[in-house]
Amino acid sequence: MERIVSRVRRLSPLHTFSDALLISLLSESDFQPDSIQQGVVLFEKDEPTEYWYLLLSGEVQLYSKTYTGDFNHLKTLRCGALFGDLSTLTHSCSCLVTRPAQLIRIAQNHFLSVYNKHGDHLQPFIIIMHDILTDETPSDPIHPHSSGLFNGQRSMDLISTEINPSEIVSVSTNGMLSKMILPSIPNQREKPMNRVVVNQQKNEERNFIEFHNPTGIEKQIRDSGGILHRKMLTDNHQVIRDITTEHTRVQNCMIGAEMIDWLLTLFVSTSTTCSSLSRIQMSAIWQVLLNNGLISHIDGEHQFLDKTNSYYRWVQQFRSRNKVAPSIEEVSKSITLLSSVAPETLFLMIVSKPGFERSPEELEVVYEELTFIKALSHLSTMVKRQLSNFVKVEQYVHAGSVVFRQGEIGVYWYIVLKGAVEVNVNGKIVCLLREGDDFGKLALVNDLPRAATIVTYEDDSMFLVVDKHHFNQILHQVEANTVRLKDYGEDVLVLEKVDIPRGAALENSNSCNFNCGYSVMAGKAEKILEYVLETRIDALGDDISELDVFVEDFILTHDAFMPDNTVCNFLKSYYFRTPYRATRDSITDSCTEEVRCKRRVVQFVYVWCSLLRVNFFLNPVTNSFVEELFCHVIDDRKRLGGMEDILTRIGSIRSTRENMQLVLARHPAIVLDCGVLSAHTPCPVLPSDVCNQIIYLADTTCFVLPIRVDKTAEEICELSRRRMSFSAEPLNLVEVKSNGEKLIFSPNDRAIPTVLSLNSKLYVVNREEIPLLVPMEDQNGPTPSSHSSILHLIDSQELAHQLFLFHLQLLRSTDSNELLYQVIGRESFPLSMPFNLDLLVRRFNEVQHWSTTEILLATEENRMEILKKFISIATIAREYRDLLTVFAITLGLSHTSISRLTLTWSKLPPASLKTFSELENLLDPTRNHRMYRLLVSKMSSPYIPFVPLILKDLMFIHQGNKSFYNGLVNFEKMHMFAKIFRSFRQCKSQMDNGAEHEFIEPQSLIRNLRVIDNQKKLMQLSYEIEPKSAPKRNVIFH
């Protein structure tokens, strides 16, 4: 009894039950839990009610059958669920075990007697099946294989957790990801432009994105394995044959090494890309098939070996009866799918080995995988490579297993690789840690007992672990590689010894063959800049394409810790730095040193303006500094020798300035005309550009007001006052969304027109009128009777191409600096608003809602064809490397209003279903969105990235790392920022390098899409198409 009570107590939420209640509840039950295999029906509807059930581990689904005999999913239950029927003599629904489960049966009569005494305590924790069945609200289906991409946290919490595809709905830019669940990510506001949210609709709290994956990954692996089996049977290599070993003759088997050779040859002959796979990667593919029971070792071994004395055979039950050779396309897709799954398997294979058995190639694989783990993102390359030798894996099969207890001596550092754990301090659960989080480090660092008890929260939780000895060894090596520079006894610069990539500048510019140097970890802002000038600038040449990484990191991130005016002031003081003269003989050397200081400043400014281009000259401080520096160089040339090359370089900078001034001095362009993108959107949008904004009053009358995009909310109110008969009473600028939500802008908020949500209206009213504001009818978007679809006018290929051209134009206008302004906080950069990023994110939301709207407004005859066409557009967009379109459409089709349309999905061809499943797999959030990052790593520029994920990564870094420690800039955080900024710049590098200056103007038809963004309206249309009683598409029974 004590053992079972202890196990139950570890389950959430039952840990709040008293011992007396648990003992009373379980007193007549068998203390040995029942183990039920996957696929077993626990009970069916209308069977006599005999038990209540307490789920200790695993997962079950409650479902019912419709009059057509189809399955209707009701609810998924996981460990800790206590479920049954109270007032019915027969079961209200059926129950299927979807993951191997352990449960305790509690006799119905006994449970009712306990419930009559302790109903107040039990009621919040029990699941009454009859209530689920009669619930009028639509259930939130959870497919056994689904997982969340943006763990439903709202506004500010959003990036501190994993993004859950099940929660991406839309994005926006005036603060953060308003629901990174991106459901409409209305307006990304980290410090939401200080806007006040009034009467937010409760129905918007719901998560409207479902990831169901119509064909599960297991089935895709089996199908791919079947294709390889058919190919092996029908080619002439005779890989499958009878083999005589030392002791016996084995029929129809294969040799491990030959299987690798055959698969390598097959890959080379069928691959349509220039990528390659190594033998170790091919081994991982066979390991995947071995793990999934498609092949087996003749002696039952569980690891695939690339050896001539390892024998395997296809599993009898799996062998394909189809003897027709598969097509080249089928083989290519199968290998591609298996190769995308294989790295995970390969990684686990390697970390299961002792460190001394890992080959250099295997250590490289482990290192690459460690780069995808969130908890290790702040560690240097050197530390990650050291961890590759020591990291191991631990797995706990059942939820409720204790990893370690409070007070124990710490022996391991843990990183959650899969699953989740509860942190329990003094008997109270304080938090939940999920994939990518780490724990147990404090006890190792301080040599103290464990401060908490850690209990697994999910079945099959898996951890990477580093033992105490190797953990401390790495710490000591890091400390040994750390150099602290002090000034008056205080740290002013902290450096770490690191490997320097070939071609990067080193400390001694005359010794460019060194393999190591120093990277800045932290320091005073001025000392970091001085370190850049002293150690990196001398080695730079004219070609900034091979720019020193540290110099680039500083320039891309300095706005976060050192404003432009501070940088310019320090450069000016460094330019006039007086060299120290020890003797008269050193006068020549001092003159040389003086010239060197001036050269460094001019070279730094050259790199700075070359990287930022027009954004450098947008700032009046840096713009005027160039002219001032030019005058100083002219004067110094008269008295110092060796200034000719400096004059040439500053002249080049000045010429660039004159060219940029022509861009900045262009006539103001119209960006948004009454909420619609103008026919020729400026590229990029400048602060002087204009939006013709419709301003509404409380009585719903309106007028059009031309507004510069950099105007504040207060200035817009004052401009509006001139058009109104208002007295001097204070006015408020209010956004009213289509769902009725009202957001009040603070007086200093800027870039108002570009951050408005789709279908929103902007009001200027006094405070008493705010409660009277309601959405208008036209904010609901198009209706079936008024909607005219462009899908009937343009084919999929052309649509995807036009979307790519337009999105490429928006991407080209967006600079990496805008990402920094957005994440640090827009209010911190009043002169540098991310207008272009606003438009890019606005477009993501627009395409996402467009795909949902078009399907819901389509006629019954055309709906399936429209759905099929969107899948086709997303597929072609992937070929164009337009990931914005790919993921916006995928998320739009995953909206609950679409995913529940079972009858529509059932008409879709299997090939389209499979294609959509592959698109959904790209949004798999595991291992820090590993699938997406691998996809991007193989792409050549230009490509259009998944912008919401970039913003999520940056916000996670910003919220998880302080910008300053003890007065020193945390430059390791800046290194992490810069790495993302570099990848963002890289995705459009071909455009920026001048390879593609002439863009084909996209058709106006695709620039502005009419959409419905009101979640309630979308669900209403969905229920009109298929009422609630219709079976749900995402219920899959195995």
Swiss-Prot record:
Tissue spec. comment: Expressed specifically in neurons including the nerve ring, ventral and dorsal nerve cord motor neurons and tail ganglia.
GO biological process: Ras protein signal transduction
Keyword list, A-Z: Guanine-nucleotide releasing factor, Repeat
Residues involved in a nucleoside 3',5'-cyclic phosphate 2 binding: 375-492
Cellular-component GO terms for this entry: plasma membrane
Record GO terms (molecular function): guanyl-nucleotide exchange factor activity
UniProt keyword annotation of Transmembrane present: no
N-terminal Ras-GEF domain residues: 516-654
All residue ranges annotated as the DEP domain in the record: 234-316
Matches recorded under InterPro entries: cNMP-bd_dom, cNMP-bd_dom_sf, DEP_dom, Ras-like_GEF, Ras-like_Gua-exchang_fac_N, Ras_G-nucl-exch_fac_CS, Ras_GEF_dom_sf, RASGEF_cat_dom
Domain called Ras-GEF: residue spans: 795-1028
Binding, a nucleoside 3',5'-cyclic phosphate 1: 10-140
Quaternary structure and partners: Interacts (via C-terminus) with drn-1.
Function noted in UniProt: Guanine nucleotide-releasing protein. Together with GTPase drn-1, may regulate acetylcholine release at the neuromuscular junctions probably downstream of G-protein gsa-1 and adenylate cyclase acy-1.
PANTHER family: EXCHANGE PROTEIN DIRECTLY ACTIVATED BY CAMP, ISOFORM E, GUANINE NUCLEOTIDE EXCHANGE FACTOR
Name the record gives this protein: Rap guanine nucleotide exchange factor 1
Gene (UniProt): epac-1
